[in-house]
């Protein structure tokens, strides 16, 4: 039986997170024998939207419509893959995976750790540095009852999935540098 996977992220955005969401979409689409894919597009700041009219854009728009129909019929998802920052993670399905670029600094905010611990079963990051920072960030905290907890940190596994880079072949450009108009030395 196919797993119903919801990708929630800025799939239509011209941004790094948009590229990340489309990368995840392509990866899941490569296994139609395993996954029935649904999409919820979220806004991403003031970034523009993809404007290409190609096969991928058509599939995204068709999947968005399929998702609206499925949600309207009260359909449930088996897995959610949430491509966003950790403070926006939610419990959507029985299995929830946060997929984030995270941060390139030395410590994760306690709010991100708390939200991840409460809502997702696993986190995927795009760099080994982010993984290390998530795993090594610890805080001394007090719970609602006043009990102190030392070295409190992330309680869910973190995996690194590196970002693919498109390889472009440069086009040959024929330029005639012989000219009498450009780069001419003028006398005063």
Give names to the regions the model predicted.
Residues 39-56, 148-152:
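Helix-enriched interaction subdomains in cytosolic or periplasmic regions
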Residues 4, 187-188:
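Residues that mark the start of a beta-strand
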Residues 1-45:
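N-terminal subdomain of nucleotide-sugar transferases
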Residues 121-186:
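Donor nucleotide-sugar binding/catalytic pocket of nucleotide-sugar-dependent glycosyltransferases
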Residues 4, 34-36, 95, 122, ...:
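Residues at the starts of beta-strands that form the adenosine-phosphate
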Residues 39, 82, 98, 159-162:
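Structural signal for conserved beta-strand scaffold positions within catalytic alpha/beta enzyme cores
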